[in-house]
Amino acid sequence: ADFAADREGFLILDEIYQGLSHGPVPYQTGLAVRDDLYILNSFSKFFGMTGWRLGWVVVPPQAIEPITKLAQNLFISPSTPAQYAALAAFDEDAMTIHGQRKDAFVQRAARLSDGLQRLGFRIPVAPDGAFYLYVDISHTGMNSMDFCWRLIDEFQVAVTPGADFGEHNADHFVRFAYTTHLEAIELGLERIEAALTAWGVNT
């Protein structure tokens, strides 16, 4: 915040994964730090409403009018049912369900991490939020693109090459998502083990 303020810059906070931490995280609103922040959020992650195209932005008062004009020229309004669904997402019962989903992500992360490491994959940074693992596949001897294509073509397991997320060592990394249920994760691990065996990769 100080860095941006010293340079008369804007500070934009992307809080799209807010609420999906795997452990307790003290939360303080960004507005307690500065009152001229731009804060972006969405219903797609924590609320599980991917594809509904719903979100919100908190902006300084002087930015409300230009941001409104920009929004009116970039997209049309979401459907009325989607907006009512978004309101319902804040109901007490709905918030309980969201909390249960978050707990399920923690269990899935642990199972997927354990299973992949047992198969020789390295996970340099354990996840502490969201629903992704960034995994080192160096021991397979493949680059990430080849690994991803072969895994989906031959064993019907979809993962994403590291190049989609940056350049640093991207050829050696892929991203796994644990957005599915534990049974599917178990099946995926079985298929990955079969793939490594078929490809002659030592685990």
Which residue stretches match the model-derived regions?
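Short beta-strand segments
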Residues: I12-Y17, N41, V125-P127, Y132-D136, ...
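Helix C-cap/helix->beta junction micro-motif
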Residues: D6-R7, L119, F155
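Active-site pre-lysine segment of PLP-dependent enzymes
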Residues: A1-L11, E15-M49, Q62
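PLP-dependent enzyme catalytic core of the Aspartate aminotransferase-like
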Residues: G141-N143, R150-V159, F165-T203
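Conserved core segment of the aminotransferase class I/II
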Residues: Y38-D103, A110-G115, A195-L196, V201
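Conserved glycine-rich beta-strand-loop-beta hairpin in the small C-terminal domain of fold type I
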Residues: L87, K102-S113, P124-I137
